[in-house]
Amino acid sequence: MLKRFLSYYKPQMGLFVADTICALVLAAIDLAFPIILRNLCGGLFTQGQTAIMQALGMIAVGLVLMYATRCACRYFVSYWGHVMGARMESKMREDLFDQYERFSFAYFDRNSSGDMMSRVVNDLFDICEAAHHVPEWIIICGIEIIGSFVILFTIAPVLALAMAVVTAVFAVIMFWQNMRMREVFSDNRKKISGINAQLQDSLAGMRVVKSFANEQTERSKFRASNDRYLSSKENMYHAMGVYTATYGLLSGVLYVIVVLLGGWLVAQGQLQAVDMATFALYISLFCTPLETLVNSAETYQKAIAGFKRMDEVLSTVPDIQDKPGAADLQVTAGAVEYRDVCFSYEDVELGAGDGTRPVIDHMDLSIKPGQTIALVGPSGGGKSTTCSLLPRFYDVAAGSISIDGQDVRDVTQRSLRQSIGLVQQDVYLFDGTIGENIAYGKPGATAEEIAEAAHRANIDAFIESLPQGYDTVVGERGSRLSGGQKQRVAIARVFLKNPKILILDEATSALDNESEEAVQESLERLARGRTTIIIAHRLSTIKHADEIATVEHGRVVERGTHEELLARGGTYARYYRMQFEGARAHELD
């Protein structure tokens, strides 16, 4: 973990060295002033008026130059030091985001978006505050503490040693308290993630919350999460309070030692009064960096807790990766074949399976180039999972899936997914314009290409009727558009992508009849000349398919045309009668 953290300093090494030099100069100047004052008081200022007045000009020039240098160094440390930290934070954030993008669906199934956002935002801010400040504080404070002690030892060894013993005892106590603070800050980080996750979940589902009038339920859930965070924060501040109080006791004890032991040494003639005054000045210089280090414990502990959480993500090996030397997928015809495929979810969720058998159980399915095949069957039977395995959103546990004879595990994920277009029931539109959302299918597409895709998706007339046209903002998740409009925007971006293979996963199930008719026409146009897999619970929308496969318990139990399956009188025929003969309402996933 330390090696990874230090690697972020490498690109900023020039700034780091300059920042370190400025920190050294700051510490040296702070150490120099008390000893300069001691020498002046014990030497020059004991001479006559003439000698003092002649030297004051030179002293003034020297002090002005010294503190002008200090001012310049302080500016550099404050400005460029923070710039260095900000650049490191930016690189860490990019690395974390890139790592998130490498993960398969399984990772996002197990982790909440609120927790992931907390790692990218809250944790990284604390990490980079420490990345800049902690080295600076260690250098400045370390030199001032050690330098002060060395100077104090040359002035009064007995008094300096007494201070060292007391400081060592307190250091052991504070180190133990520091370990306790690390646990508290780590727990606090988890509680922050809990609040972010709960907040994100509630806000994203606010329309559902209001439709059920469950605002009070969500308030209760949020307050419970907030109370846990408050309790954690109270524990954190308690630990910090004990820590800072211990420091306060240390500085008080040191001053008592200086007054009592120093006074005794003066009385014994072993210490001059001017030296005791200098000693008092250095005590302040000795304690101030100690206080800085104590106060930095919060920043340091937050950074440690945050970087551990970041390191957990960066150290996680993506479960789906390209093979070394993987070639790009070359789709010539678009033939798809599932051969003896088995798959089960690592964490079984509602509808994914019962945990006792694979979701996909030795499935065999061949799809000819340009063929449209529809998958039907009961909820949890494995239809959506079958489609998710083709673009390698999940990897098969056994068997193989190939496109034009190429195993999907042997080609690059990028080329594989670029060859597959996906239109789902739950369309996700980004918070941008309609044009930007369509162009997502082909980044860098021209305005003419975007307009042509919209025309083919039967949404160009609607877009052009809007005052802002293609520059109309759709809102978060497309909230300003209707369900049918969102579906056609999604279809338009797949037209723009122009893939050889198409997956339609219940693309019309949530639409009214009028919207469904318009979207269905667009989908049929999209599917022409492409190998297409359709999942639909409205059997009327798949009668045009070349073949229909019934999937139950992760296997294809029957396959044929609409007419063939009806004549066979099997599972498909039973579902068809349920829908169209009014036997009873039955929905298929």
Predicted segments, located by residue:
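An intracellular "coupling" helix at the cytosolic face of ABC transporter transmembrane type-1 domains
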Residues: 105-106, 122-131, 135, 139, ...
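Helix-loop junctions and hydrophobic alpha-helical segments within the transmembrane domains
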Residues: 96, 100, 209, 310, ...
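ABC-type nucleotide-binding domain
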Residues: 329-589
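Helix-loop-helix
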Residues: 46, 52-54, 151-165, 239-308, ...
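Conserved catalytic Walker-motif region of ABC-type ATPase nucleotide-binding domains
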Residues: 100, 222, 338-340
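Transmembrane helices of ABC transporter permease
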Residues: 11, 15-25, 62-66, 133-187, ...
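Transmembrane helix-loop-helix hairpins at lipid-water interfaces of multipass membrane proteins
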Residues: 16-76, 153-158, 269-273
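Juxtamembrane loop-to-helix connectors within ABC transporter transmembrane domains
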Residues: 9, 77, 81-85, 101-146, ...
